[in-house]
UniProtKB/Swiss-Prot annotation:
Entry GO MF terms: 4 iron, 4 sulfur cluster binding; ATP binding; metal ion binding; nitrogenase activity
Pfam families: Fer4_NifH
Protein name per its UniProtKB record: Nitrogenase iron protein
Organism: Chlorobium limicola (strain DSM 245 / NBRC 103803 / 6330)
Positions of ATP binding: 8-15
Function: The key enzymatic reactions in nitrogen fixation are catalyzed by the nitrogenase complex, which has 2 components: the iron protein and the molybdenum-iron protein.
E.C. number(s) listed in UniProt: 1.18.6.1
Amino acid sequence: MRKVAIYGKGGIGKSTTTQNTVAGLAEMGKKVMVVGCDPKADSTRLLLGGLQQKTVLDTLREEGEEVELEDIIKEGYRNTRCTESGGPEPGVGCAGRGIITSVNLLEQLGAYDEEWDLDYVFYDVLGDVVCGGFAMPIRDGKAEEIYIVCSGEMMAMYAANNICKGILKYADAGGVRLGGLICNSRKVDNEREMIEELAKKIGTQMIHFVPRDNFVQRAEINRKTVIDYDPTHGQADEYRALARKIDENEMFVIPKPLEIEELESLLIEFGIAN
């Protein structure tokens, strides 16, 4: 079972990218579980046809200790297994702590057991590595390979670099490695070249460039992944390609994060800061 975490700055399209990629893997016949690690609890919506899933933390609050696995895991597109950790009530408690509680509960209830015959588990993790809780999949060896969703925008690259610092911090202890950058295009000038160069400097690869296409939003409005909504659309092939590249990937590195000056000079070199 491969344990994958998808990171990236808030609003970059992690949940969309994760679900569309998982749909591609499921279409290839892979058995996948998706663990949403975001208080918004939108990491599995498209795989479940828009169903707003009850989160692990909500279920715990309501049911107490009497929680069964089927209470917190739903079957989605092509038998993907979907669960959302959820978060505390706004303004109370720590969302990172919620992830720790949820993943521990999933382990206790046997969600990762061999009987499920999982090929992959994907963790879709909120925003930047802002606190120890959100770093938990990296820190405790829950995830072994990390992919960072970014774009050619300055803050997305800054966040990607910060996440690399988090991976570097825990690489020796947890055995976690960076599998590559996924460029979720925002149509920034020289975007592909800039992210390829950023990847090279960090010591990794840009595993795929996902072109911007409003069809992704159209599929989302219809509460589906692109592959589910229209398997013949060109954008569906982009996600199939990304799924295949992840499935075949053998490049796993300890990243070399850049100094802020290096990052800024990269932005200047490719014209974004001009």
